[in-house]
Amino acid sequence: MKQLLKFLLCLILVAPSTSIWSQKKTDPSKNGRGGYEYFIGVVGNPSVVSDMRWDDEQLEGLKELGVNMLQLSVAWGGKPGNEVINLEDLDAEQTAKWKYRISQAEKHGFKTIAHFGIPRMLNFDPVKPACIMEHAIQDKYVHLIQDFMSTFPEVNDIMVYTYDQQAWICSEFGPCPKCTGIPISDRLPGFLDLLKTTMQESRKDAKTTLWWKPWELSKGQTIDIIKKIDPNGFGLMLNPSTSNEVYPFNDGSFKSDLGVKRMVQYAYERDIPVIGEFDHTLYKPLYAIDDYFPRLMYEQMIGWKEMKGIVGVKEYYGFAPSVYSVNYAMLKAWMKSPNAPLEELLNQIAAPYGKKTAPLMIQAWEYVAQSVEAYPWDVTYLIGPTGLDRNSSGEHSWDYVKIMNGTWDTPIWESSRRANFMLTDSKVAHPWIFEDAGLRLNDAAELSFKAVEYFDKAIAMNEGLVDDIKMQRDFILKTSRSMKGKGLHFALTIAAQDARTVQGDPAQFEIVCARIKSLLEEDVENGFAEAEVKLTEFNRDPKAWLKSNFKPLTWKSEAEPDWSKWITP
């Protein structure tokens, strides 16, 4: 009896530890890729063509990051590095390139995914879509998919853009005779079903998935298509915002973007897997803003993780290892420990800088993150000319400020994005928009300047990695000056017109002139040498100065051809 009791006691003691060990072994969060089934990476990015290399070192680095699937080309609209973006691009040279990439991927344990724009436009400018209601177009893509599946038997996943990537869909409002009067959300599901069925029939002994990116479609159209599509062998690839691109912050995305929430929810209810895209760099090195804001990287990953039905994530712009990235360090740390709190991961990635320096680096990165959040993203899509031009160091013209805005003839731009951006196709805008943009640029600049102060304190510690800290500090200082200079351009434009408006009232004119003088002094302090001359001229004769600086041409208006009138036959 005693022996039986001892045996039972041993079972009781051993069972829990065995169960815990089993849980640890099977805990999905411990799989090295944030617990996801998929972590898709892009080798290189459109701005760093030299990093589009599929050598052993590059691929091992991505494997260590947690990536388990690779996109076979950078697939960017401008075709940097002559990368494939359409099935039609796969000539003998490109096929050989992909064969090599697939062999390299298999060598290092990666699966692969192709990325195409379908259907490719018949004419690019003016746009003429390839009509998906035409039997000839349908047959063409059935044959192209069949050829692809035969040529690349290792590839079971294809990602498709039906807008952008040189693809386009006919409008229901004309002029296509087959599509006029038929909504896109009634036409596109059948075409997508045709593509994925062709994949399935070409690879009957394997699981294939057509991943669709509903880029440029409105929220309503996308949701309607999700409801109508056959979910078998179909998946969604979604941005973190229905109206913005894949920026590394939560403004207008995740919890606050009901469009993303609804799409993910409908997909979940229909057993459609979703892969969420993220950008860990903000198009680095395209704009004057670099990836030194790890908190935003963390929040972006948490945002996707909190949604039901997200089976994986995909880097949107690509990985360029030759360009240093603090955000990359955070991404790597999060993928290994997705349940760890932010503070723990920040301490981990800051540790190499030294015990005394690490807290200073964390504070500097936090101010950079706040600066990114403060930037006026919602004014215009064209952020480069609005303080983030990489070549700017704070200089500006002495003409009145303008806001470049842009739009395209797509469903999303004519609907949801008009709520996301204040200006899309406006020729004029209320001065308050200009005032708002200038004030927020100044706020973003001040936060970046605070980051520079902490980078300077970190450098003074002289514990280690000083050259790296200096690199971060110098770049953020340049960005600070660029945003500050652009903010001053906005402020001076408004102040100058204010002064012209009240110049008949000496007391009021003096108040506004004091404001202009203060702004010019800030311009000088920001390192803009030309502002010193302008300040001297203004102090000498304010009224004469106002006649030649930031002067609106109220008698002149520029017109250009209405390019939408050209329709390709």
What does each model-found stretch correspond to?
Residues K2-C10:
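Sec-dependent signal peptide recognition
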Residues D89-A96, K128, I132-D139, K178-R187, ...:
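Alpha-helix capping and helix-loop boundary segments enriched in small/acidic/polar residues
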Residues Q23-V142, Q146, S150-T162, I272, ...:
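Feature activates predominantly on carbohydrate-active enzymes
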Residues P119-R120, Y163-A167, W215-Q221:
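Short, internal active-site loops enriched in acidic
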